């Protein structure tokens, strides 16, 4: 197994991911929302690129759907919820379809469509993701969604943790950047303390979203592995 890493949604190249297993990560907060919603009984998640796309999907059967997402970390006007995983409780999401659009995460998911398998990963389900990757036994590309096309510490250390979980079970051939991600995690296993240095952490912290951050940095509290088969994500 070969493991490589892409540092942002803007850096995805089809030839790099084609026929590979891909894990898309946006721990602050899109993939954490997706994992949480599905774990709490949401039927499926439909990630879209634009607000207008989301509105078109829900317009004819509003009761079936929840609209969730953000632009610049803030709730979108007319949407039911923001991009906080804490919003997506069982009483809200059970038997519903979540239609979501975010600045970084949904773009990364759509960018991965030429992959063989697309798994939705976060710190909260990282070990389960690693186990699924081992089961699939294919070359792996981890896509960090990043922040507005830039590198994100938070996604990078999550990638390192997933790699660490894989390496505890088998050998793998790591690219230089995958080696670096694994090293960064190995030296910073207290995720909460490390992630506070991240640019995106400070954006969310300044908006009063520290509870979101603490939740999203929690390891392995969910054991599902969502998969994207266009146009929807299911567990």
UniProtKB/Swiss-Prot annotation:
<dbReference type="GO" id="GO:0050545">
    <property type="term" value="F:sulfopyruvate decarboxylase activity"/>
</dbReference>
<dbReference type="GO" id="GO:0050532">
    <property type="term" value="F:2-phosphosulfolactate phosphatase activity"/>
</dbReference>
<dbReference type="InterPro" id="IPR005238">
    <property type="entry name" value="ComB-like"/>
</dbReference>
<protein>
    <recommendedName>
        <fullName>Probable 2-phosphosulfolactate phosphatase</fullName>
        <ecNumber>3.1.3.71</ecNumber>
    </recommendedName>
</protein>
<dbReference type="GO" id="GO:0000287">
    <property type="term" value="F:magnesium ion binding"/>
</dbReference>
<keyword id="KW-0460">Magnesium</keyword>
<keyword id="KW-0378">Hydrolase</keyword>
<comment type="similarity">
    <text>Belongs to the ComB family.</text>
</comment>
<dbReference type="InterPro" id="IPR036702">
    <property type="entry name" value="ComB-like_sf"/>
</dbReference>
<dbReference type="Pfam" id="PF04029">
    <property type="entry name" value="2-ph_phosp"/>
</dbReference>
């Amino acid at each position: 197994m070969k493991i490589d890493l892409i540092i942002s949604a803007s850096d995805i190249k089809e030839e790099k991911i084609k026929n590979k297993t891909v894990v898309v990560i946006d721990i602050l907060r899109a993939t954490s929302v997706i994992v949480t919603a599905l774990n709490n009984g949401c039927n499926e998640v439909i990630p879209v690129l634009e607000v207008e796309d989301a509105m078109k999907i829900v317009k004819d059967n509003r009761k079936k759907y929840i609209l969730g997402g953000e632009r610049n970390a803030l709730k979108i006007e007319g949407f039911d919820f923001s991009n906080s995983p804490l919003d997506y409780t069982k009483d809200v999401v059970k038997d519903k379809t979540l239609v979501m659009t975010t600045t970084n995460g949904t773009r990364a998911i759509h960018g991965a469509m030429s992959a063989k398998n697309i798994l939705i990963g976060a710190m909260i389900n990282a070990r389960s993701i690693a186990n699924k990757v081992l089961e699939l036994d294919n070359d792996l590309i981890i896509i960090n969604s990043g922040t507005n096309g830039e590198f994100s510490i938070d996604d990078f250390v999550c990638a390192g943790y997933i790699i660490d979980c894989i390496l505890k079970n088998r050998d793998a051939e790591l690219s230089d950047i995958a080696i670096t991600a694994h090293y960064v995690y190995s030296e910073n296993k207290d995720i909460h303390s490390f992630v506070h240095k991240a640019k995106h952490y400070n954006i969310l912290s300044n908006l009063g979203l520290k509870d979101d951050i603490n939740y999203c940095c929690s390891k392995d509290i969910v054991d599902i592995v969502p998969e994207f088969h266009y146009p929807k994500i299911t567990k």
